Amino acid sequence: MNVQIREIFLDDLASLWEVAYRNPNAEWTKWNGPYFKDVLPTRREFLEKVGPTDFVHNQFKNIIIVDKQIVGMVSAYYEDGELKRWLDVGIVIYSTENWQKGIGKKALKLWIDYIFSIVSLPHVGLTTWSGNLRMIRLAKRLDLEKEAQIKKVRFWQGKYWDSIKYGILRED
């Protein structure tokens, strides 16, 4: 299995929308910060506005390719906004058929290495929630250090969950 990450091009948007956003009730939406209740873009919104503006040629968003097919996305964002000193990464593998196959581990490792190559920051973080056991296992498998656990700050399905922060230093 050949796992790659790469920049998103305009030609990728239709395929990316099909894989990621076609089904608004896709299983991945239940694990990727579901407490935010984000609304997925329509095909038209994604192809005409959101995709070209926020995804195409964005150094902080790459697609994950396995055997020439889009299977997910990696991303990064500044926790501290315009200060740009605190960067977190994220990953989504869209289809459950591609879960538990090591794709996430390979892709996130490539992504963290890439992020360290384009920014001069000493630290990269990853934030998840206590209900997302797969993401917690992934962080541990990549030797990210658990740096914080903020108790009961994420409310989902009638229950409070913890926010969990992991990180890695450049020299690690």
Name what the model sees in each region.
Residues 25-49:
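Conserved GNAT-fold acetyl-CoA-binding loop/helix
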Residues 13-21, 43-48:
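An amphipathic alpha-helix signature
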Residues 52-57, 144:
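Short loop/turn motifs at secondary-structure junctions and domain boundaries
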Residues 1-15, 19, 61-172:
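Acyl-donor (CoA/ACP) binding surface of acyl/acetyltransferases
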Residues 24, 53-54, 119:
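A general structural signal marking secondary-structure boundaries and capping sites
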Residues 49-52, 114:
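A generic secondary-structure signal
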